[in-house]
Amino acid sequence: MNRRTVLGSALIGAAAATAGSASAQSAPKPKGKTGPRNLITDVAGIRVGQAHDANARTGVSVILAEVPAIAAVDVRGGGPAGRETDVLKAENLVQEVDAIVLSGGSVYGLASADGIAAWMGMRGRGYGMGGAAGVPPSPIVPAACIYDLANGGDKQWGMDPPYRTLAVQALESASDSFTLGTAGAGYGAQAGGLKGGTGSASAVTADGWTVGAIVAVNSVGATIAPGSRQFWAAPFEIDAEFGGLGSAELSAAHEDWGDAKFNPRPRENTTIAVVATDVALTRVECQRMAIMAQDGLSRAVRPAHAPFDGDTVFVLSTGKITIDDPAQRNIAVSRLGNIAADVLARAIARGVYEATAYDGSATGTWKSLS
């Protein structure tokens, strides 16, 4: 074989390899698998109920653990509104919660957890020190709220804000299915310059573990790229769950925040979420998962964790699946945390994608964009 033949063979081989590589790069990448509902309720032991007041433009979402669940929380925003978050610190006594409430109403919305606690205590559910006769239990009901007081709804409620009543209505309607978009805690939300809402998503691993998230999206930051309809969460989308526009042209200059709320001025905000898994985790492991899940906010919202936000993520472990090998636990927590971030990013995009305008609202929806 002469030199020319050898060179020609090498070029043909290189061209074939390049073509194969290009073909591999252009081939559709495998996507993850969602649960049957693509909701947080795909996690065994979790139900969700929602209620809203259309006149006040506000609402409540209750995430119910069918039996008390191990929980943790991570707070990153500069202006949070929360209840019982200190209870969830790893050094404290109580490990399990009965429910978590996401609510509109800012400080007024914190009363939503009062309604849940009273409802549960009356039925004998909650933390107790021996259950002495006549001593009610103490239901553990952490809560976080978004600021939706300036969205044009009637907030002249005087001494009777609606949140306690809305929370009980939500709890009593808790089920496996619930509405996304303009519903529940996200009813009165605004995400950047678009109508925000309640979003949810889930993922199932090859091992059969399930991770789900529910979120009220009321961010100061934008969920779409500047000059685009593409969601920042697009790289993580499964089965066109929020429009299927892809991520090929996602880009932005570092000072271009697009449709954020900084024009004309920053306004009150907060994105609040609950992530759940059916894998049995300790409080410390739930805490690590919550920390990692916050990355989902950064993947889906730009900017995130701003001084004007109150970004808060709770994690629940329902303990249906156990991992007995100690050597595998840290790996499992790492996997769960990464999946949680992706699922939360998807849930954020779904909340905005599914949002609809209420009558008289000046805030455009994602679906109204041309």
What is each model feature region?
Residues 114-121:
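Active-site-adjacent structural elements in enzyme catalytic domains
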Residues 113-114, 228:
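Short amphipathic alpha-helical segments
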Residues 1-13:
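N-terminal secretory signal peptides and thylakoid transit peptides that target proteins
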Residues 17-21:
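C-terminal segment of classical bacterial N-terminal signal peptides
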Residues 29-107, 122-370:
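A structural signal for small-residue-enriched, beta-sheet-centric alpha/beta enzyme cores
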Residues 22-26:
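Boundary at the C-terminal end of the N-terminal hydrophobic targeting segment
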Residues 6, 116, 167-170:
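Hydrophobic side chains in well-ordered alpha-helices of soluble proteins
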